[in-house]
């Protein structure tokens, strides 16, 4: 769904818009085949977000799983996923890959700014995103909060700043192993 893809990118990367604090930051997209094969990685400027949406639609239609780097990459970055490529964080997030962790996320006394549902079969899977009051440049402090949030809900230990997460508006295609465990292709919303 190109509209959901665009919305997800625009919410995550509002700080890249002109006249904001980080106009030269880059958004990172990655597309992975469900079983094996070559990934596709691409960095986009804020002004190229239409091309980012188009690429996501095409790659997903070709059976690739869509992911987005949660935080912008530094201007001039040519890679997609190294810690040194992320100079500031705008979000804390949590990856709940099972129903128990997803339920705990929804029970926390502080609600996420937004939630991405990555699947419902065989169990509910959610990503919760919390916008920071100010961009974080102390990556050690950021990582410590990521660990605490994951521990609080029993989520995946996704603590690194260059982390990629499922891209809303794309279909999640399970691997053969996951399909055998009851996962089915589902729209990430």
Feature annotation, model-predicted:
Residues 115-129, 165:
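Short, conserved phosphate-binding/catalytic loop or strand-edge motifs used
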Residues 30-34, 96-97, 118-120:
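Short loop/turn segments at strand-loop or loop-helix junctions that form parts
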Residues 46, 130-133:
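Secondary-structure transition/turn motif
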Residues 8, 32, 43-44, 127, ...:
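Small/flexible residues
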């Amino acid at each position: 769904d190109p509209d959901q893809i665009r919305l997800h990118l625009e919410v995550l990367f509002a700080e890249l818009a002109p006249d904001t604090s980080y106009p030269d930051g880059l958004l990172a997209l990655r597309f992975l085949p469900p079983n094996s094969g070559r990934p596709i990685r691409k960095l986009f400027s804020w002004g190229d977000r239409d091309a980012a949406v188009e690429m996501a639609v095409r790659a997903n239609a070709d059976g690739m799983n869509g992911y987005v780097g949660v935080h912008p990459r530094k201007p001039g970055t040519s890679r997609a996923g190294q810690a040194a490529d992320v100079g500031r964080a705008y979000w804390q997030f949590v990856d709940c890959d099972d129903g128990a962790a997803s339920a705990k996320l929804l029970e926390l006394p502080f609600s996420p700014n937004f939630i991405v549902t990555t699947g419902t079969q065989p169990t509910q899977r959610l990503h919760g995103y919390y916008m920071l009051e100010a961009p974080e440049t102390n990556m050690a402090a950021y990582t410590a909060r990521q660990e605490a949030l994951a521990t609080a809900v029993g989520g995946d230990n996704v603590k690194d700043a260059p982390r990629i997460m499922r891209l809303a508006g794309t279909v999640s295609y399970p691997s053969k192993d996951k399909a055998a465990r009851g996962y089915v292709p589902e729209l990430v919303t």
